[in-house]
UniProtKB/Swiss-Prot annotation:
Pathway: Cofactor biosynthesis; (R)-pantothenate biosynthesis; (R)-pantothenate from (R)-pantoate and beta-alanine: step 1/1. Catalyzes the condensation of pantoate with beta-alanine in an ATP-dependent reaction via a pantoyl-adenylate intermediate. This is Pantothenate synthetase. It is found in: Cytoplasm. It comes from Shewanella sp. (strain W3-18-1). Its EC number is 6.3.2.1. The reaction proceeds by a bi uni uni bi ping pong mechanism. ATP binds at residues 30-37, 149-152, 178, 186-189.
Length: 281
């Protein structure tokens, strides 16, 4: 696997592949990789001739008092895992490479509406940072296909909307959430959990499952939401949000809607965990 922090190196290699008529997949990450990331890379390797991965802890998507400085950097272990998974080109830029003028002078991309609810309401500016860096990375790598995890459901819809609105010639593929045996969604932030917190963490997925089951049995959105919140508090969580939305638009779900997604963010100790459950009724 080739590793470079320089934009020109990435473009040169991708151009060489394209000159031979070969396809390029891209998996953007912030590093500290787990099996969920590796699954994205393996899926990408099956879909395209070549796989490019980026590791960049993006300062633009972190708010004040968030965990930018504490976010784990594990490049050596990540590189080894990516090589085994089938990645051929790893882009490891610095903030100065991505934002040479600094954040205050950076042109940004903002996806209105869908970026302003749920995590966007709890973390103002977060999706501006996500959309901006992903757009920049797409312009640098110029992939045919890009892979993202369904665990970050709102992020996936933000990126799909950005690609559609800006007419970017990139196919966006969402990959199912990878979970630990307990049901806990794999996340780089699971490392913040203590042993006792990790034992309690599967209650988040169980709450979503119970909500979906209740809705299918005819319970109201309000009933299942209150029951789920109570179960989360009992397990030691402090919910940030727990909402039922239209699966395609993230608009507030209506009783007649068939395509639904339950989205949750909740604090457990120092960790802010997110999860979702997409279902039809």
């Amino acid at each position: 696997m080739i590793t470079s922090a320089h934009i020109d190196d990435i473009r040169t290699q991708v151009r060489a592949w394209r000159a031979k008529g070969e396809t390029v997949a891209f998996v953007p990450t912030m590093g500290n990789l787990h099996q969920g990331h590796i699954t994205l890379v393996k899926e990408a390797a099956q879909k395209c001739d070549h796989v490019v991965v980026s590791i960049f802890v993006n300062p633009m998507q972190f708010g004040q008092n968030e965990d930018l400085d504490a976010y784990p950097r594990t490049l050596a272990a990540d590189s080894e895992a990516l090589t085994t998974a089938g990645a051929e080109l790893l882009f490891t830029p610095t903030p100065a490479t991505i934002y040479p003028k600094g954040l205050a002078q950076q042109t940004f991309v903002e996806v209105p509406g869908i970026s302003e609810v749920l995590c966007g309401a709890s973390r103002p500016g977060h999706f501006r940072g996500v959309a901006t860096v992903v757009c920049k990375l797409f312009n640098i790598v110029q992939p045919d296909v890009a892979f993202f995890g369904n665990k970050d459901y709102q992020q996936l819809l933000v990126i799909r909307t950005m690609v559609e609105d800006l007419s970017l010639p990139i196919e966006i593929i969402g990959v199912d959430t990878i979970r630990e045996a307990s049901g806990l969604a794999m996340s780089s932030r699971n490392g913040y959990l203590t042993r006792d917190e990790k034992a309690a963490a599967p209650a988040l997925k169980k709450a979503l499952d119970a909500m979906a089951a209740g809705i299918k049995q005819g319970e109201t959105f309000e009933q299942v939401t209150e029951q789920a919140k109570a179960s989360l508090y009992a397990a030691g969580f402090t919910p940030d949000y727990l909402e039922i939305r239209h699966a395609h638009t993230l608009a507030n779900a209506e009783p007649e809607d068939k395509a639904l997604v339950i989205l949750a963010a909740a604090y457990l100790g120092k960790a802010r965990l997110i999860d979702n459950l997409r279902f039809d009724r």
